[in-house]
Structure formats: structure tokens, C-alpha cells
Amino acid sequence: EEYPNRLPDEQVVTFVPQNEEFRYGADDMIEFFSKNPVKTLLLINPDNPSGNFVPMEGVHKLAQWCEDNDMQFLLDESFVDFSVGFKNNTFLDNALLEKYPHMCVMKSISKSYGVPGLRLGIFCSADTALIARMKKQVSIWNINSFAQFFMQIYPKYREDYRVACEQFIQARED
């Protein structure tokens, strides 16, 4: 909801799965956006609120399709920590970003760690020109002291967080 509201309605093309479960994969998105071209493709993976998850091979397929079609690919991984095998489901990897220069990966730390007031997140891309443009747009002090403190104490709780994510995944599977 936040992303489309940043653009005029006529610039937003929304993909809605045509099934009762609201499930979709890379092929469904490629088919839809081949008929409804866009400059930027946004995938929230896993999706919120449906929980739909496009596996890594599907995300690779979308990323390559975007490269082949000179299309920006925004991948929001804010909830990837709650996916089965989450450690292997992220594109926050320099080699992957270099492979797909049209890709940008975002992750809200605030959401997954349950600290939404901090407004803390990650944005990664191999597109250094894009990063430079973005840096010019953010305020000089773009992280507050609470968020900075959180990042300082995070390593102390990293293992607890990993265990909690695995317990959450197991509870959902049961």
C-alpha cells in the first residue's frame, strides 16, 4: 500500500492473482507484465498480507527477465526471515546484486524485529549511480539515536531472533 501511493494512479499497474488462494509465481508475473509493461517491477517476498512466497529460482527468473527487458526490479524482503529456509532466501548478497544490476533489494528491519517506530531498513543495489542519487535525497542525519542504539545491541540478540523465526515458521507449518 505504501509503494503505489507514491505514484499517480495512472502510473501504477497492479497484479492481482486470479485464484482464491491469491498464490502466484514468477511465470504468472512475467505473463501479466509482458501484457502490461512497467518501468519498475516490485515484488514483496513473502507478500504481506497473503504470505505468498516466490522461491529463489522464481526470483532469479524475474530478475533475469527484468534485466532482459531493461526494467528496474525492486525486491522487498522485509518478511523473508519468516520463510522456510530463510537464510537461503535472500538476495542481500553482493554477487547476486552484481549479477542483476537492475535489481534493488529492500528490507525493513523495523517490521521483522518488531520495532516499527525506529523506521530502520536496508537498501542495496549494484547500481552505484542510483545509490548516489538516493544519498543526495536523504537527510544528513537519516538514522535516529534509538535506531542507532538498536543496531549496537542487535548482535547480542541475533541468535534469539533466529530461534524465534524458526519457532514462528514451525508454528505456522503445524
Locations of regions flagged by a protein language model:
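Short, contiguous strand/loop micro-motifs
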Residues: 16, 49-50, 162-163
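Active-site pre-lysine segment of PLP-dependent enzymes
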Residues: 23-35, 49-112
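Structural motif
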Residues: 40-44, 74, 122-124
